[in-house]
Amino acid sequence: MRLFEGAFQPWKLASTNLMQQCLLLNKKSQFHTTCILQGLKKQKANQRRKQNLKRREELRKQNLDTLADPIIGHSSEWIARLLKPYEILVERKKPNFPIRSIKFPASMETINLIVEKFEKIRASATEETKDFIKLNEVNEFPSSDTSLESNQDGFERLHPLAERLERMSQLSDLRKESIHRIFNIENSNSKTLRLNNKQLAVESFARNERDTGSPEVQAAVYTSRILALSDHCKNHKKDQTGKRMLRYYVHQRQRMLKYLRKVNFDRYVHCIKNLGLTDELVLREVTQ
């Protein structure tokens, strides 16, 4: 055994290395820093993300007055007169909904004329009823000094006449109320509101009485459709057909405005001012 005391003993080296590796494994199993480091990285990333979103919102609010949406544009007096179907359909469920008249299929002046005609018809019908019941028989009754209750025959003759006249008056009032309800915005659907906006566009931008095809009128009609579809798509994000139609209307409006800009620049400036657009918005609202 003394022969191997100073010699190389590999089995001792192997056992020593094995013991050292076991000690290192035990130390590593006791101290884990990977989860802590990853948690700090995620926390810093979330902080940077929140700061970026906050900064983006601040920039959006700062540019809200200077930069407008290339599709919707700025608010104008004509746009404020348009009826927005989605907002009206939501607001009319409230108890204090304002009563407003519509222009399509008839204006309020036409409705008043219809009501006046009903009043004339009622008056003429009342006169005919009086003649039919032979009111001349009433003149045969005793004078006013004599009480009507003392003459039962006269009371029986006047009572049916009073009932008929009262029924005719109630019927006329119901007809008048029905006409106003039919043409009230509260009982209108979205299609009627869109047609009302179309009629308003023709009245506001027509160059003459029968002008329905000028670029100004067509651009105004497209603008009313764009605003209505934009509100619809914001509340119905899965409506792909509505989004395609919105994109189509935007392209058609830009086409009309570019043509008007080429033909008559003064008319173009007046038109886009009423529509709430600018020259820059028209040129960059469609980039492809």
Curated annotation (Swiss-Prot):
One GO MF term attached to the UniProt entry: structural constituent of ribosome
This protein's UniProt keywords: Mitochondrion, Ribonucleoprotein, Ribosomal protein, RNA-binding, rRNA-binding, Transit peptide
Transit peptide range per the UniProt entry: 1-50
Signal peptide: none
Pfam hit, one: Ribosomal_S15
HAMAP family noted in UniProt: Ribosomal_uS15_B (MF_01343_B)
Subunit structure: Component of the mitochondrial small ribosomal subunit (mt-SSU). Mature yeast 74S mitochondrial ribosomes consist of a small (37S) and a large (54S) subunit. The 37S small subunit contains a 15S ribosomal RNA (15S mt-rRNA) and at least 32 different proteins. The 54S large subunit contains a 21S rRNA (21S mt-rRNA) and at least 45 different proteins.
Protein name: Small ribosomal subunit protein uS15m
Gene name linked to the record: mrps28
